[in-house]
Amino acid sequence: MIIHAYKYHGAGNDFIILDNRKFQYNSLTTEQIKLLCDRHFGIGGDGLMLLEPGNRYEFSMRYFNADGHEGTMCGNGGRCLVAFAAHKGITNFEFEATDGHHHAEILELGERQCIVKLKMIDINQYQQYSENSYFLNTGSPHYVEFVEDVMEYPVDEKGKYWRWHKDFKGGTNVNFVENVWTSVLPKQFGL
């Protein structure tokens, strides 16, 4: 199978994008997607996305994690997919993802750079997990823990622990946040 792949970068993440509007990539397996995302033996990426026809909108987004398994909504990925859709001639940027409807707009479109504004779902609920940690869903699950000093915190160790914690079936994104005066400095583990 010949695969026409595109590579997009957004806010520190990189993604492989395939135009699947004719469903020619529906036969890709978990192992094949994992291999494509492998940074040593494939194209390399934090995930793979398929641009597909939408049911209610012009297009939809299917997201796969780098391990090859289908994932949930990814904001950085969504912005990259909208830029890709624009480069493919799509002009209406309302689309469907696993968490529902999204609206985006292109603020600036260049050949190699695109600025995209993406409306994520509103977060109406969150679950307090401990005194300083919370679980919430932004379209994908997030464990958020407030820490004293994010630069000194063992992000890798704690991130690995929480990423696949038994309470979060299917895994979760892990964010460690330090309050700095009136602003916030986040540091994320994983995707």
Features from the language model and the residues they span:
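A glycine-rich beta-to-alpha transition motif near the start of alpha/beta enzyme domains, typified by
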Residues: 1-112, 144-191
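RNA pseudouridine synthases
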Residues: 126, 134-136, 144
